[in-house]
């Protein structure tokens, strides 16, 4: 708490924009760099999204560019307004306090910036930044000894989140939209309660028709596989009519393992092909990389454990119950041991909280707060900026790289050595970096002792 009462008399040039003594000149440089990088980030993102959603020609002609420029303006404003409020606060207060270089300057800048962005994107941005801020605050608590980290905590969080997600998935009107479609794709329609409304004889008839239509072209191996899959233990409550319980789980594992393996391969293609001509041997690493198999094992085991547990509980209890999804979902979450990811756990947990909150609003049990997404985004972004200034070691490395890219590397040029007086180890990861300042624009000369009032 003693650090909160301290202050330093340095100017905004000596602490913040050390590369340029002019506040306005620094603002223009940050704006230019942020605009270039924002456009590079959003241009391919919007183009790929439009292609995947199969937008018509009218969208490309009339809507794509305005939406792209709006998002670019939002991200540019978030960076440029931060340096603007950084200088404004210094001039208004006359000194720098613990909260002003990071949180104080980023809060109004982030709130003003998010109002520029389209409303349809604010919710997603809020969840993303809330995840970043929560992780940063957690690391701050661990650093200060306020919080004791739990071993495999991200796996435990994923287990709890998975259990609740699968329970809502099994309940009628529990999940809607993308979340429902995604889980339906992952675990299959056989686990949807509405699927039980379709009588078994419909599947038998469809199966017989497909046999008659394709019987001539099937080989003996295919026929043997059908016999193995369909002639085995299957509980009367199980809706996987074309498989027994064992083959149902095995097929689920193979399918999602293949999808996870291919996804990770596709993600590695750009970095691999950059070195195709200089190091051709790296092409083999695209297919034999450890992470490819880890993601495949994670997705495959998640589905097989969930399906296997669901079938087991139907056999044991002799009924199909939505509560089975809680147990099956929790056990399936252990599959994250193959592919540990705090990002995935935090994101899904945040989306779950959002889902439950909106369900509470629909039920009339939770109050609705207008502009809550904008406020949460502003506070979360301010926390992340504060961590980036005062204790970057507690910020997620990927977000620090993003800030560096957005500011063309200028975020690392801040005089964090002078901020060490606030006891946050601001210069810890910067090798005691001290910027070269023009003495003509300095309030505090390097050789003079500082007065911390």
Curated annotation (Swiss-Prot):
Keyword Cell membrane (UniProt): no
Spans traversing the lipid bilayer: 68-88, 96-116, 149-169, 293-313, 326-346
Membrane-related topology note: Multi-pass membrane protein
Gene Ontology BP terms: regulation of mitochondrial fission
Keywords: Membrane, Mitochondrion, Peroxisome, Transmembrane, Transmembrane helix
A Gene Ontology cellular-component term: mitochondrion
PANTHER family: TRANSMEMBRANE PROTEIN 135 (PTHR12459:SF15), TRANSMEMBRANE PROTEIN 135-RELATED (PTHR12459)
UniProt function note: Involved in mitochondrial metabolism by regulating the balance between mitochondrial fusion and fission. May act as a regulator of mitochondrial fission that promotes DNM1L-dependent fission through activation of DNM1L. May be involved in peroxisome organization.
Full protein name: Transmembrane protein 135
Gene: tmem135
């Amino acid at each position: 708490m003693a650090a909160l009462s301290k202050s330093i008399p340095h100017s905004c040039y000596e602490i913040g924009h050390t590369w340029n003594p002019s506040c306005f000149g620094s603002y223009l440089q940050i704006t230019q760099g942020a605009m270039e990088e924002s456009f590079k980030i959003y241009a391919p993102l919007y183009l790929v999204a439009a292609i995947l959603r199969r937008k018509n020609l009218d969208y490309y002609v009339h809507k794509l560019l305005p939406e792209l420029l709006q998002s670019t303006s939002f991200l540019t404003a978030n960076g440029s307004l931060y340096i603007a409020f950084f200088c404004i606060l210094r001039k208004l207060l006359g000194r720098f306090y613990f909260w002003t270089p990071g949180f104080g300057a980023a809060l109004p800048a982030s709130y003003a910036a998010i109002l520029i962005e389209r409303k349809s994107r604010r919710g997603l941005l809020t969840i993303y930044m809330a995840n970043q801020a929560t992780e940063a605050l957690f690391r701050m608590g661990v650093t200060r000894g306020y919080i004791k980290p739990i071993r495999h905590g991200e796996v435990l969080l994923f287990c709890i989140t998975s259990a609740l997600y699968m329970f809502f998935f099994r309940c009628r009107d529990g999940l809607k939209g993308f979340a429902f479609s995604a889980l339906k794709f992952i675990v299959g329609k056989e686990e949807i309660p509405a699927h039980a409304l379709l009588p078994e004889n419909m599947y038998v008839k469809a199966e017989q028709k497909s046999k008659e239509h394709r019987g001539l072209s099937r080989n003996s191996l295919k026929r043997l596989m059908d016999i193995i899959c369909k002639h085995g233990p299957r509980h009367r409550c199980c809706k996987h009519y074309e498989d027994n319980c064992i083959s149902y789980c095995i097929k689920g594992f193979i399918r999602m393992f293949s999808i996870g393996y291919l996804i990770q391969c596709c993600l590695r293609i750009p970095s691999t092909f950059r070195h195709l001509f200089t190091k051709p041997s790296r092409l083999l690493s695209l297919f034999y990389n450890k992470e490819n198999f880890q993601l495949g094992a994670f997705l495959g085991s998640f589905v097989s454990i969930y399906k296997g547990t669901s079938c087991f509980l139907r056999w044991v209890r002799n009924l199909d119950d939505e509560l089975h999804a809680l147990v099956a979902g929790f056990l399936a979450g252990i599959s994250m041991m193959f592919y540990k990811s705090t990002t995935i756990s935090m994101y899904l947990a945040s989306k779950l909280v959002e889902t439950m909150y909106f369900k509470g609003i629909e039920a009339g049990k939770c109050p609705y707060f207008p502009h809550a997404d904008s406020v949460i985004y502003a506070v979360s972004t301010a926390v992340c900026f504060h961590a980036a200034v005062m204790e970057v070691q507690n910020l997620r490395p990927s977000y620090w790289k993003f800030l560096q890219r957005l500011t063309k590397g200028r975020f690392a040029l801040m005089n964090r050595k002078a901020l060490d007086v606030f006891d946050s180890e601001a210069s810890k990861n910067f090798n005691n970096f001290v910027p070269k300042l023009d003495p003509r624009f300095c309030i505090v000369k390097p050789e003079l002792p500082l007065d911390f009032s």
